[in-house]
A protein has these predicted regions:
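Nucleotidyltransferase catalytic core that binds NTPs
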Residues: 23-181
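Conserved post-catalytic alpha-helical subdomain immediately downstream of the catalytic base
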Residues: 1-19, 23
């Protein structure tokens, strides 16, 4: 069994069950993000084993090199990376009409396909505050021009880390280039 092969109490997720039943080498064509409750259970299990849980969030609408570099750097800060992904309605409120370009299910699939991403959790609000209250990660990571004092939900993480933006990459720039602007 999956849980038996782990030290301590371990919640078996639906992705692990599919891997066990169908083989982990199968080509995935979909990913169902885990619920907040499943994510909390995993975070608690990882932390009980002394493993560091890193959390970041974003829209990740058109995944690009800047996103990948940022997520690799975030993942390197601990053993597990969880991404809070803005739901479609949240992205629309934050970014305006015509966004997101990619649906939340497609964005979640692309993020989960990255080997250094452990889980993706969708949130409907404009900020991840309630999700951070639920998960209480060891490290909360934000990108670019934030100051630690301005990070929403910092009180629910052990520490906050600010990583630099990768210059020259943004979803808005990609969209404008495609549109010939």
């Amino acid at each position: 069994g999956i849980a038996v092969s782990r030290v301590g109490t371990y919640p078996v997720g639906h992705t692990e069950m599919i891997d066990a039943w169908c083989g982990s080498n199968m080509m995935r064509t979909a990913y169902i993000p885990i619920s907040w409750e499943e994510a909390k259970s995993k975070v608690d299990a990882w932390k009980s084993q002394g493993e560091t849980v890193v959390f970041t969030n974003g829209c990740f609408d058109i995944l690009h090199k800047g996103h990948i570099t940022y997520l690799q750097q975030a993942a390197a800060l601990g053993e597990h990376l969880i991404i809070g992904l803005n739901a479609d309605e949240s992205v629309k409120k934050l970014k305006g009409e015509g966004r997101p370009v990619n649906s939340e299910s497609d964005r979640a699939f692309m993020l989960k396909s990255l080997r250094f991403v452990d889980e993706v959790v969708i949130f409907n609000e404009e900020t991840p505050l309630e999700l951070l209250k639920c998960l209480e990660p060891d490290i909360l990571v934000k990108g670019g021009d934030y100051s630690v004092e301005d990070v929403i939900g910092k009180e629910y993480a052990g520490e906050v880390r600010i990583l630099p933006f990768v210059k020259g990459y943004s979803t808005t720039q990609i969209i404008n280039k495609i549109l010939g602007k």
